[in-house]
Amino acid sequence: MFIQEPKKLIDTGEIGNASTGDILFDGGNKINSDFNAIYNAFGDQRKMAVANGTGADGQIIHATGYYQKHSITEYATPVKVGTRHDIDTSTVGVKVIIERGELGDCVEFINSNGSISVTNPLTIQAIDSIKGVSGNLVVTSPYSKVTLRCISSDNSTSVWNYSIESMFGQKESPAEGTWNISTSGSVDIPLFHRTEYNMAKLLVTCQSVDGRKIKTAEINILVDTVNSEVISSEYAVMRVGNETEEDEIANIAFSIKENYVTATISSSTVGMRAAVKVIATQKIGVAQ
């Protein structure tokens, strides 16, 4: 594991006084040290072992950043804050130690070969503590991305919080926003192309201008591209201000219009607004 060195500045001396400042040798070493730090932050540190990372197969800078691939023995030393690591537990579980951080510091781990498992986990130990974790944080899901960020660094101790997510999969939200229901009493909201997803789950909230009438619901929709239909199931419905049990406040229907799955929301209440968010999607054919 390459140990980064603090930034070095060349002493340029005093103008007109040739006897001041760094000599060429010292200045060149400082430049090399600074460039090594840059290339080892944004490139493969393993390539430093050959010709200091130079040559045809030497280090290159990755604009997206680089997740370092270290051996298990190298992780006996605490990892530096601000670094990224690609963890391989193919042969045995890996334990990493995070050094004390300052507020806002971040460390990231990924598992690009999917080797993390219950048998060979990634174990993360903070020198101080990880919020909500008693002892070490143990990650057992393959292809995980773990992000830790320092949320407190008072009195010489630091507290880290974390998130764990899959490296892969579709995570986009094809539709999210707020629409005004027009004076005609309805609004069409295009969600996504009819062939883009097989099903989707939505959160829908409708509210009057004065806030006295509110309806919220979760809705599952299934896209039938053969018959050009959308089948929906509305559940977890909550209403405020409905005059009778039959008063829906707002009606939500789905159809395919101009090749787009479309939500049509209608209401007899003037000035109603509708917030719609697609919170999950599913498509046959997504990679495992």
Swiss-Prot record:
GO biological process assignments: viral release from host cell; viral tail assembly
Superkingdom of origin: Viruses
Keyword Coiled coil: yes
Keywords, in A-Z order: Coiled coil, Viral baseplate protein, Viral release from host cell, Viral tail assembly, Viral tail protein, Virion
A cellular-component GO term for this protein: virus tail, baseplate
Induction of synthesis: Expressed in the late phase of the viral replicative cycle.
Keyword check for Lipid biosynthesis: no
Subcellular location(s) of the protein: Virion
Pfam families: T4_gp9_10_C (PF23618), T4_gp9_10_N (PF07880)
Regions annotated as coiled coil: 20-80
Domain notes per entry: The C-terminus is bound to the baseplate, and the N-terminus coiled-coil domain is associated with the long tail fibers.
Subunit and partners: Homotrimer. The gp9 trimer interacts with the long tail fiber (LTF) that comprises gp34 trimer, gp35, gp36 and a gp37 trimer. Part of the baseplate macromolecular complex which consists of gp5, gp5.4, gp27 (central spike complex); gp6, gp25, gp53 (inner baseplate); gp7, gp8 (intermediate baseplate); gp9, gp10, gp11, gp12 (peripheral); gp48 and gp54 (proximal region of the tail tube).
Function according to Swiss-Prot or TrEMBL: Peripheral baseplate protein that is part of the tail fiber network. Connects the long tail fibers to the baseplate and, after virus attachment to a host cell, probably changes its conformation to trigger the signal for tail contraction. Involved in the tail assembly.
Protein name stated in the entry: Baseplate protein gp9
Lineage of source species: Viruses, Duplodnaviria, Heunggongvirae, Uroviricota, Caudoviricetes
